[in-house]
């Protein structure tokens, strides 16, 4: 599926597309709630979850064959907690790299989901913990955080 990089609203765009094998995440994406929910054949994701994305519930839920590496650019307003529930339960596994976006976080430092002003490490660790809490027991997902980040 070719989605233009300028696309912002992707909620439910391919929800339940059981034959979808690969997808590119647009760099302008903001709302991605249930975009690829139930895409059971989805294996490959290109692009990254941009820091502009603040709505991503059930983004890849039920995508059991996800594999490779996906980067998520994170701010204090990022929530990915239910984005990967029941995902990557088959196949070779998925690695998610959480990268802190200090520039975008400065805009929302006191209004973020993680309780106001927090360090990059605190935000990334809280985000990682909230994501891992929603993985199914059979998920082959590894989350790492990018240590090369700057604080504002």
Language-model segments: residues:
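Structural signature of tandem-repeat unit edges
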Residues: 1-8, 18-30, 40-54, 64-78, ...
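Short, flexible/disordered intra-domain loops and linkers
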Residues: 105-116
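Consensus positions within tandem repeat domains that build extended binding/scaffold surfaces
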Residues: 11-15, 33-37, 57-61, 81-84, ...
């Amino acid at each position: 599926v070719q989605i233009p990089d300028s696309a912002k609203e992707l909620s439910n765009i391919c929800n339940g597309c059981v034959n979808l094998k690969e997808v590119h995440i647009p760099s302008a994406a903001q709302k991605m709630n249930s975009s690829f929910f139930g895409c059971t054949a989805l294996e490959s994701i290109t692009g990254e979850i941009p820091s502009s994305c603040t709505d991503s519930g059930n983004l890849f839920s039920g995508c059991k064959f996800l594999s490779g590496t996906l980067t998520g650019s994170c701010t204090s307003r990022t929530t990915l907690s239910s984005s990967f529930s029941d995902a990557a339960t088959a196949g070779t596994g998925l690695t998610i790299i959480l990268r802190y976006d200090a520039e975008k976080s400065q805009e929302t430092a006191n209004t973020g989901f993680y309780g106001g002003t927090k360090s990059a490490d605190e935000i990334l660790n809280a985000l990682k913990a909230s994501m891992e809490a929603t993985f199914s027991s059979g998920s082959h997902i590894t989350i790492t955080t990018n240590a090369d980040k700057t604080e504002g």
